[in-house]
Curated annotation (Swiss-Prot):
Domain of life (superkingdom): Bacteria
UniProt name for this protein: Large ribosomal subunit protein uL18
InterPro entries recorded: Ribosomal_uL18_bac-type, Ribosomal_uL18_bac/euk
GO molecular function: 5S rRNA binding; structural constituent of ribosome
Entry function: This is one of the proteins that bind and probably mediate the attachment of the 5S RNA into the large ribosomal subunit, where it forms part of the central protuberance.
A Pfam family annotated for this UniProt entry: Ribosomal_L18p
Keyword RNA-binding in record: yes
UniProt keyword annotations, A-Z: Ribonucleoprotein, Ribosomal protein, RNA-binding, rRNA-binding
Family: Belongs to the universal ribosomal protein uL18 family.
Amino acid sequence: MSSKSKFVRRQRIKRRVRSVVSGTEQRPRLTVFRSLSHIYAQLIDDVNGHTLVAASSMPSKGASLLKGKKSDVSREVGKALAEKAKAKGIDAVVFDRNGYRYHGRVKALAEGAREGGLKF
C-alpha cells in the first residue's frame, strides 16, 4: 500500500468518525496525532471549538525529553494528559483515534490515559 493511499484511507476514516464522534465540555474528544518520532494528544470541546488540554512527547520549555521506546513514551504522554485533565475537572472522554489503527502507540496512549484515571 503506497503512502498516498494510506493517507487517503486515513482521511476517509477520519471524516466518517468525525461525523459521529463529538466532544462536549463535560466529555471532550481525546484525539491523537502520530508522527514518525512523536505523539500528540488533545482534549477538544467541539461545541465551542476549543482545545481544553494537550500533551505530547515533544519537550516544551524547561521539560526534559522523554526517553525509551516509542510505545513507552506514548503511555507516559497518556498519563500526563490524564493528570492535566483531572486538574481541569475532566474525568470522562470520547476517544478519537484519528483514523489510526488501535494498535501500538495509539493503544499505549489510550491505556496510559486509562491508568491516569480517564474513562472512555
